[in-house]
A protein has these predicted regions:
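Short amphipathic alpha-helical segments and their helix-coil junctions
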Residues: 33-53, 85-97
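N-terminal export signals and maturation junctions of secreted/periplasmic proteins
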Residues: 6-34
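Amphipathic alpha-helical regulatory regions
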Residues: 57-68
Length: 181
């Protein structure tokens, strides 16, 4: 594993960071932006695609695209813009057996792009992998509940409603053929 990938993983799995991962924290977002925005830019421009040759480097790439995007671009549609690439990388990682070479905490973040997806097929993939790869996770019950809540939102709304204010384009409302104007 290269030094940058190791630095990303060391940062993300540090005990101090664990408490901040899923909370809105502008200071934490700024730390990620300062430390890893350059890496994120390289990842989205395919400069880090060779990281996919090794399981833990692949995980670092997924964290850059899936997790750090949400911190770097909070409240901006760019926060979700790279989810598709992260999912494609995860698909390859699963196919290549990389999950077998990770611990349960690493597997969780490798699979999280499926739950971040607004496509129900990705949620189905996540559930198929959940019991096989995360049943030994100490927070397995909470993870399953968390994922179920996300999946129910997708089934009900076909998207994550909390993203509406960030991602919805209102141009369709001004088209002359729109019956609701």
């Amino acid at each position: 594993m290269n030094d940058r990938a190791k630095e990303i993983l060391d940062f993300w799995f540090d005990d101090m960071v664990v408490e901040k991962r899923f909370k809105r924290d502008n200071n934490f977002d700024q730390v990620i932006k300062n430390k890893f925005k350059g890496d994120h830019d390289k990842a989205i421009s395919n400069e880090y695609d060779d990281w996919q040759d090794e399981p833990l480097s692949t995980l670092a790439l997924v964290i850059l695209l899936d997790q750090f995007s949400r911190n770097i671009y909070r409240d901006d549609k760019k926060a979700f813009e790279f989810d598709h690439k992260a999912r494609l990388i995860v698909n390859d990682a699963v196919y290549n057996g990389y999950l077998d070479k990770m611990d349960e905490y690493q597997r969780f973040f490798m699979l999280l792009p499926y739950i971040h997806s607004e496509e129900i097929i990705d949620h189905d993939r996540a559930y198929k992998l959940l019991d096989n790869y995360l049943s030994d996770h100490p927070n397995y019950v909470e993870i399953k509940k968390f994922w179920k809540e996300h999946t129910l939102a997708i089934k009900r709304f076909h998207r994550y409603p909390h993203r509406n204010n960030i991602t919805v384009s209102y141009t369709h409302l001004t088209l002359p053929t729109t019956p609701y104007v």
